[in-house]
């Protein structure tokens, strides 16, 4: 099961009171519902690919209106796609859609009733229904954090974004496949949205995975940085040894001033140690790291002069 499916499964298990159940059902029907005729009577079909969401729609209708509906299963044969589930309401359709402020003549309204936007719990419930109807969220294991809600109607999409942004979540909108989406890209905002709509367990899982992933990335960066520093130190030490050996072969280390000769001989004897360790090994030491570095730079410069024939 995908992470998005786990989130939706958790949401379908939330117990809601009548007012909030109404707001959630309002979103589910507005986004996934269609009106038809059967035997000269109006029917409502609400379609989903999730059996859990189909059961949720069925339960909400029964809870609010004490009306039974049918759940139909349509099998998709092509490409082994998921089945489609249709919750079909045959009785009291106009009354129920009127109560939900969804029906406009024989069409579903795009706008959400303004009185809904004044109640915090109803907004959260509506957003939960909207996510169940058209939402998806990337697995936090991936490097691309993304949560979106798809809607057929531009005005409805803008209103969903407005609801989300009441909670400072920086939701944005764009066009998508003959429809519209509202989306979140920031991990912290996605986690806050999941908590907002009631997916607390999924939010905690999201945060745990994200924290572990971020820590792993930080460790990798530190290791890479440490490896780069070690390579840099090793390359510098190799260059120092090569230059000291050149000096020894050309003019002999005995020709060097005492302090330079001491550091040169110590470096040849301890080629892999750091500058700090080298300073503790020099006869007559210890010498500070900066002091060791200063003397080695002098040896490097002297070796370069020997290569150019300037110091002989």
Curated annotation (Swiss-Prot):
Keywords: Cell cycle, Cell division, DNA-binding. Residues 274-308 bind DNA. The keyword Amino-acid biosynthesis does not apply. The keyword DNA-binding applies. It holds the Pfam family HTH_WhiA. GO terms for molecular function: DNA binding. It comes from the Bacteria. Gene3D superfamilies: Homing endonucleases (3.10.28.10). One of its GO terms (biological process) is regulation of sporulation. Involved in cell division and chromosome segregation. Belongs to the WhiA family. This is Probable cell division protein WhiA. It comes from Limosilactobacillus fermentum (strain NBRC 3956 / LMG 18251) (Lactobacillus fermentum). The lineage of its organism: Bacteria, Bacillati, Bacillota, Bacilli, Lactobacillales.
């Amino acid at each position: 099961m995908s992470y998005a499916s786990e989130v939706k499964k958790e949401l379908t298990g939330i117990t809601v009171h009548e007012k909030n159940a109404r707001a959630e059902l309002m979103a589910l029907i507005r986004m996934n519902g269609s009106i038809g005729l059967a035997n000269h009577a109006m029917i409502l079909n609400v379609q989903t690919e999730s059996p859990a969401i189909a059961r949720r729609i069925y339960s909400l209708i029964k809870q609010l209106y004490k009306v039974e509906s049918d759940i139909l299963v349509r099998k998709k044969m092509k490409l082994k796609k998921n089945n489609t589930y249709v919750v079909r309401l045959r009785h009291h359709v106009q009354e129920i859609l009127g109560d939900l402020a969804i029906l406009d003549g024989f069409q579903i309204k795009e706008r959400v009733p303004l009185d809904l936007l004044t109640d915090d719990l109803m907004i959260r419930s509506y957003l939960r229904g909207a996510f169940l109807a058209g939402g998806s969220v990337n697995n936090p294991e991936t490097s691309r954090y993304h949560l979106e809600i798809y809607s057929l109607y531009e005005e409805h999409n803008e209103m969903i974004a407005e609801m989300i942004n009441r909670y400072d979540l920086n939701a944005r909108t764009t066009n998508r496949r003959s429809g519209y989406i509202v989306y979140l890209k920031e991990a912290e905002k996605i986690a806050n949205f999941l908590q907002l709509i009631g997916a607390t367990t999924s939010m905690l899982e999201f945060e745990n995975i994200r924290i572990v992933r971020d820590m792993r990335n930080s460790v990798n960066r530190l290791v890479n940085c440490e490896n780069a520093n070690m390579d840099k130190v090793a390359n510098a030490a190799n260059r120092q040894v090569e230059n000291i050996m050149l000096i020894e072969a050309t003019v002999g280390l005995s020709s060097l001033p005492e302090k330079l000769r001491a550091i040169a001989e110590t470096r040849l004897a301890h080629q892999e140690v750091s500058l700090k360790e080298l300073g503790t090994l020099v006869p007559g030491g210890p010498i500070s790291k900066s002091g060791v570095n200063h003397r080695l730079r002098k040896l490097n410069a002297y070796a370069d002069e020997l290569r150019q024939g300037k110091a002989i």
